[in-house]
Curated annotation (Swiss-Prot):
Binding site for orotate: F34, F35, T128, R156
NCBIfam families in alphabetical order: pyrE
Stated name of the protein: Orotate phosphoribosyltransferase
Transmembrane feature ranges: none
Length: 213
């Protein structure tokens, strides 16, 4: 586990974005942990979040020309990641996001920010069913741009209804790499380091055995 990944887990725990216990997911599965990125909801939270996204992007080595944040949750993520790349990595890159509803006056259209072109890095909080990614791909392809990759905060590394995860489906369908700041693997490694959190380790491991990819 890299230092920024450990720091991100601690940041998520401190904001109660990441919780351990027993939770029922939308899929009906009982999960021993829950991640709600919507609780990163202050200026300082967003500034820090952008630094973690930027770190993961630089670490990945993937080449891209523009950041795209799908409405709605992806919008602040793309914005803060663009700021962090410029301030901390000397990479001043354009960013763009979409509107859910096309504007009929003024500048018009359903895209805001830089022109959507070149190699696009899509940033979002998580991938659950991959629906938002598919909708974004239609927008990206309509502009003649290419998807360079997808970056999310957490990869749960678990199967969907079939034998592979929603993330693996996205990688298969669009031929792109999906990267994340952390995965279930790092969460387990973190729990293994923390004796005071040992009570959660067995249930998280059991969950991985049942649903892991």
């Amino acid at each position: 586990m890299k230092p920024y990944q450990r720091q991100f887990i601690e940041f998520a725990l401190s904001k109660q974005v990441l919780k351990f216990g027993e939770f029922t997911l939308k899929s009906g599965r009982k999960s021993p942990y829950f991640f709600n990125a919507g609780l990163f909801n202050t200026g300082r939270d967003l500034a820090l979040l952008g630094r973690f996204y930027a770190e993961a992007l630089v670490d990945s080595g993937i080449e891209f020309d523009l950041l795209f944040g799908p409405a709605y949750k992806g919008i602040p993520i793309a914005t803060t990641t663009a700021v962090a790349l410029a301030e901390h990595h000397d990479r001043d890159l354009p960013y763009c996001f979409n509107r859910k509803e096309a504007k009929t006056h003024g500048e018009g259209g359903n895209l805001v920010g830089s022109p959507l072109q070149g190699r696009v890095m899509l940033v979002d909080d998580v991938i659950t069913a991959g629906t938002a990614i598919r909708e974004s791909m239609e927008i990206i392809q309509a502009q003649g741009a290419q998807l360079a990759g997808v970056l999310i905060s957490l990869d749960r590394q678990e199967r969907g209804r079939g034998e592979i995860s929603a993330i693996q489906e996205v990688e298969r369908d669009y031929g792109c790499q999906v990267i994340s700041i952390i995965t279930l693997k790092e969460l387990i490694a973190y729990l293994e380091e923390k004796p005071e959190m040992a009570e959660y380790l067995a249930s998280v491991r059991a969950y991985r055995e049942a649903y892991g990819i």
